[in-house]
């Protein structure tokens, strides 16, 4: 894409927000409490701070302040304020391609705020438990939060992901012409690695004229043992395995499509 010569600072705001979901089946009330305690510890404020700090290095941000809090009975929040150092726009890659994976992170840019909130949830009947994390990476200027997408999804090992990317505001070039987006994008999927795309069913709902891009992701492979807590499939009879599989599948479909579906 042709590089714009800007008048002053790039005033565009780019926001990447997504929900990730982890689904689990627990057979007893004690198992349910155990899963909630386990997932709450796995994604406590300290670990989330580590993940978000690494995210800062991916988008090239300088950390100004970190606010973090664990909650009772469960949940955690982390917010990081970040700033951008002066950079040469010619050094910024705005092309559509996946960002780095966790083992290949290199700091190369800088910028705004990054936050995450977690929501463990369960119901006393049915045995289903869900863990949801809401994440937002918002930057101003030339830096793209999309570069953090690959890393965050890999780190959080999600069953279901809903992603929203939007560009707000405008910037002017040296001739005074407004530009409401400064990079090419057809789909958020173009910023994901091929191995990630192979793992998920994906669906796009994009509003191009408004610079709004929405992608939903649902894990393709279903292996019951990955969704059971404190019990293995071998300990269940065939009827129980089918009932639990149907229950989990229905739950995941409802979350993926964002609506209540009839039980078949």
From Swiss-Prot:
Record's keyword annotation contains Lyase: yes
Pathway assigned to this chain's UniProt record: Amine and polyamine biosynthesis; S-adenosylmethioninamine biosynthesis; S-adenosylmethioninamine from S-adenosyl-L-methionine: step 1/1
Pfam families, per the entry: AdoMet_dc
Coiled-coil segments: none
Species in which this protein is naturally found: Pectobacterium carotovorum subsp. carotovorum (strain PC1)
Cofactor note: Binds 1 pyruvoyl group covalently per subunit.
Catalytic activity: S-adenosyl-L-methionine + H(+) = S-adenosyl 3-(methylsulfanyl)propylamine + CO2
Site (Cleavage (non-hydrolytic)): 111-112
Active site positions, chain numbering: 112 (schiff-base intermediate with substrate), 117 (proton acceptor), 140 (proton donor)
One Gene Ontology term, aspect cellular component: cytosol
Required cofactor names: pyruvate
UniProt keyword annotations, A-Z: Autocatalytic cleavage, Decarboxylase, Lyase, Polyamine biosynthesis, Pyruvate, S-adenosyl-L-methionine, Schiff base, Spermidine biosynthesis, Zymogen
GO biological process: spermidine biosynthetic process
Gene that this sequence comes from: speD
Modified residues (Pyruvic acid (Ser)): 112
Description of post-translational modifications: Is synthesized initially as an inactive proenzyme. Formation of the active enzyme involves a self-maturation process in which the active site pyruvoyl group is generated from an internal serine residue via an autocatalytic post-translational modification. Two non-identical subunits are generated from the proenzyme in this reaction, and the pyruvate is formed at the N-terminus of the alpha chain, which is derived from the carboxyl end of the proenzyme.
Protein name: S-adenosylmethionine decarboxylase proenzyme
One function term, GO molecular function aspect: adenosylmethionine decarboxylase activity
SUPFAM superfamilies linked: S-adenosylmethionine decarboxylase
